[in-house]
Amino acid sequence: MIESWVLIREQSVDEEALRSLSLANAKHLVLGSVSGSGVILHVAANSAADLGNALGKFSEVPGVNEVLTLAIQNR
């Protein structure tokens, strides 16, 4: 399992749009918003490839400007 903390930088994304995103082999938890910066997520995936796919899906959400990985832990 690989886990990551992610910052979603956005202009006007509803947190519910991020919460309801369906990821194939990964699970995510919206931890909350950071004033002026975006939304922090925790993502757990089966493999590095699955994590990459999940990050790609987040980047496709309308209004998302950047998807930044803050930390990665491989368990």
Give the ranges of each region predicted by the language model.
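A compositional/biophysical signature of low hydrophobicity enriched in polar/charged and small residues
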Residues: 1-75
